[in-house]
Amino acid sequence: MSEFRLTQISDTHLARRLSKLTDNFHRVSERIDATRPDLVVNSGDLAFDGPTHRDDLEFARTLHDALPAPCRYLPGNHDIGDNPTQVGPPPSQPVTEQNQQTYRDLRRRPLAF
């Protein structure tokens, strides 16, 4: 059986207007290029402010598409908003169906393998 190599990343918080975070992602991309995993999983917060800036999600998706390995995503609170809790204040960006649909639409774009 061959070895399956997985790289997990998270909290990239990407936005075109935040060059330092983009620079960080490029360093991560260089490491992924050097190690060539079979799959990359971003476990949330791809974008800096997906609920109010769809372009943040689109920018994040473009950078992830350029990775030298297939990539899958899980949504984080910076991507679709927060769920309310019983103990804390209400979220400033609650999860909405529209935010979830925007995220799903970006995920449905074909992935290159």
Positions of the model-derived regions?
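N-terminal active-site segment of His-dependent metallophosphoesterases
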Residues: M1-E58, L63
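Extended active-site neighborhood of metal-dependent phosphoesterases/phosphodiesterases
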Residues: D55-F113
